[in-house]
Swiss-Prot record:
Belongs to the zinc-containing alcohol dehydrogenase family. It is an enzyme of class 1 (oxidoreductase). GO terms for biological process: L-threonine catabolic process to glycine. Its cofactor is Zn(2+). Pathway: Amino-acid degradation; L-threonine degradation via oxydo-reductase pathway; glycine from L-threonine: step 1/2. It catalyses: L-threonine + NAD(+) = (2S)-2-amino-3-oxobutanoate + NADH + H(+). GO terms for cellular component: cytoplasm. Keywords: Cytoplasm, Metal-binding, NAD, Oxidoreductase, Zinc. The lineage of its organism: Bacteria, Pseudomonadati, Pseudomonadota, Gammaproteobacteria, Alteromonadales. The record marks D148 as: Important for catalytic activity for the proton relay mechanism but does not participate directly in the coordination of zinc atom. This is L-threonine 3-dehydrogenase.
Length: 341
């Protein structure tokens, strides 16, 4: 089958023919329709330090997808051939304390689809049926293909009550932009998004941000004054992994504020812990999606009128995958879709 493979321990990705995966007793065989390129895929493409320490070569990459069930193991229940599905890319063990307690997203033995097991950038994917999620008929293939990063946005944004709150989002990557759309949709008051990428900030504005701030040109405090904010932000969503952005967030939080952190900072980050202690801030780390509460929330948000369509800015045939990776790497895109049909 046609697959995108990290075939060499160097920059790049290669379209190759690989064997069709075998289906286990509890697995689904999914024929891929569309996939989306993730920031993780760009790390793997660029072969950075994280990738060199994490990715087995060769491996089929990719974990954002939608497809159709075309086969299943004999023990599978609840699915039928022809079902349209996406799926949770974190494959969990089922036997650790968190898994047995129902906190599956906190499994310490998690494997990643397209990271350390074969991924979705292929004509066919096999995953445990437990990890698959049926896509409602009124949600398009394009939107279904980005459920994985949309789930990161939903998990982060809905970690704390947002109704009537002022929300600061640092980092206008696709996940930060989708988080802004979610926050506004569920009733946040002011949703302010910071970054230094004008293209992405304009996209955030289209997706519902009250105000976008290019912090290389504007002062966040001036924007807060402009919005009539006298007490700081109630909720912070740190999506950038940039230390100076996190420090600025701590500085601008109201007393009793809550921060959800999805962005991954460098190993050593200096933090003024006095801001955390004396303001009584709560900081929560976010990894992936809650299984499967986040998935049901994603479907419900879209069915209740949340419009994510502007975040998908480019679509390429899989044969033009290089254009897709170049576009994603340019910083002048939202989500980039690869069409396998």
């Amino acid at each position: 089958m046609k697959s995108l493979v990290k075939a060499k321990a160097e920059k790049g990705i290669w379209l190759q023919d690989t064997p069709k995966p075998e289906v286990g007793h509890n697995d689904l065989l999914i024929k891929i329709r569309k996939t989306a390129i993730c920031g993780t895929d760009m790390h793997i493409y660029n072969w950075d330090e994280w990738s060199q320490n994490t990715i087995p070569v060769p491996v089929v990459v990719g974990h954002e997808y939608v497809g159709e069930v075309v086969g299943m193991g004999q023990e599978v229940k609840g699915f039928e051939v022809g079902d349209r599905v996406s799926g949770e890319g974190h494959i969990t063990c089922g036997h650790c304390r968190n898994c047995r307690a129902g906190r599956v997203h906190l499994c310490r033995n998690t494997e990643g689809v397209g990271v350390n097991r074969p991924g979705a950038f292929a004509e066919y994917l096999v995953i445990p049926a437990f990890n698959a999620f049926k896509i409602p008929d009124n949600i398009s293939d394009d939107l279904a293909s980005i459920f994985d990063p949309f789930g990161n946005a939903v998990h982060t944004a809905l970690s704390f009550d947002l109704v009537g709150e002022d929300v600061l989002i640092t980092g206008a990557g696709p996940i930060g932009i989708m988080a802004a759309a979610v926050a506004k949709h569920v009733g946040a008051r002011h949703v302010v998004v910071t970054d230094i990428n004008p293209y992405r900030l304009e996209l955030a504005k289209k997706m519902g941000a009250t105000r976008t701030v290019d912090v290389s040109k504007e002062n966040l405090q001036d924007v807060m004054d402009e919005l009539g904010m006298s007490e700081g932000f109630d909720v912070g969503l740190e999506m950038s992994g940039v230390p100076v952005a996190f420090r600025d967030m701590l500085n601008k939080m109201n007393h009793g504020g809550k921060i959800a952190m999805l962005g991954i900072p460098p190993q050593d980050v200096a933090v003024d812990w006095n801001q955390v202690i004396f303001k009584g801030l709560v900081i929560k780390g976010i990894y992936g999606r809650e299984m499967f509460e986040t998935w049901y929330k994603m479907a419900s948000l879209l069915q209740s009128g949340l419009d994510l369509s502007p975040i998908i800015t480019h679509t390429f045939s899989i044969d033009d995958f290089q254009k897709g990776f170049d576009t994603m790497g340019s910083g002048h895109s939202g989500k980039v879709i690869l069409d396998w049909q």
